[in-house]
């Protein structure tokens, strides 16, 4: 049986789950990555980590900093450096909007997911976010616990 044509197929490689806890997500966007061949092969083997990474604006371009893509095991002397800077491919309009938000409002750009889209291209889901304070994190956790408790009560009653 064939898949429906309109459903996007995303093979998620890495997810930054702590970002939703540590930051208040205000807006998301999709960005491409400039990768080498061994990086793509390593990603296809589901090996990467974006938990400690962030995006920064330098020399008129956005760069992904501190992302980890391990060396490809079958790679030879042309293998890549695991923690190198990776250029993000974003439209100029998005880039200027992100730059203005980051420089003026004290926000940051954090990666949420790294995945292959339906055409096999590596994409990064970025979020424009504001850091949460400790009391905000506690409040979010209380709301989440209360929602779970409500769902449990409704399930047990009904």
UniProtKB/Swiss-Prot annotation:
| Chain segments carrying region Disordered | 132-158
- Give one Pfam family: SmpB
UniProt key word 4Fe-4S: no
User: Cellular component terms, GO, for this chain's entry?
Assistant: cytosol
User: Its Gene Ontology molecular function terms?
Assistant: RNA binding
User: Could you tell me where this protein is found in the cell?
Assistant: Cytoplasm
Question: Spans of biased composition, class Basic and acidic residues?
Answer: 136-158
- The yes or no answer to whether the keyword Cytoplasm is present is yes
- Example GO BP: trans-translation
Provide the alphabetized UniProt keywords.
Cytoplasm, RNA-binding
Per the entry, what this protein does is: Required for rescue of stalled ribosomes mediated by trans-translation. Binds to transfer-messenger RNA (tmRNA), required for stable association of tmRNA with ribosomes. tmRNA and SmpB together mimic tRNA shape, replacing the anticodon stem-loop with SmpB. tmRNA is encoded by the ssrA gene; the 2 termini fold to resemble tRNA(Ala) and it encodes a 'tag peptide', a short internal open reading frame. During trans-translation Ala-aminoacylated tmRNA acts like a tRNA, entering the A-site of stalled ribosomes, displacing the stalled mRNA.
Q: What is this protein called?
A: SsrA-binding protein
This chain's source organism reads: Brucella anthropi (strain ATCC 49188 / DSM 6882 / CCUG 24695 / JCM 21032 / LMG 3331 / NBRC 15819 / NCTC 12168 / Alc 37)
């Amino acid at each position: 049986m064939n898949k429906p044509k309109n459903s996007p197929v995303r093979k998620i490689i890495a997810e930054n789950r702590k970002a939703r806890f540590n930051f208040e997500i205000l807006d998301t966007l999709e960005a491409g990555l400039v990768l080498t061949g061994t990086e793509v092969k390593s990603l296809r083997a589901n090996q990467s980590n974006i938990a400690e990474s962030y995006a920064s604006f330098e020399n008129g371009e956005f760069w992904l900093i501190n992302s980890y893509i391990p060396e490809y095991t079958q790679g030879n002397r042309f293998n890549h450096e695991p923690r190198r800077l990776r250029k993000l491919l974003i439209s100029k309009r998005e880039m200027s909007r992100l730059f203005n938000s980051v420089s003026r409002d004290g926000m940051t750009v954090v990666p949420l997911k790294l995945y292959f889209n339906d055409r096999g291209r590596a994409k990064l889901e970025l979020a424009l976010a504001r850091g949460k304070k400790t009391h905000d994190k506690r409040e979010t956790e209380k709301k989440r616990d209360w929602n779970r408790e409500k769902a449990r009560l409704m399930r047990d009653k009904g």
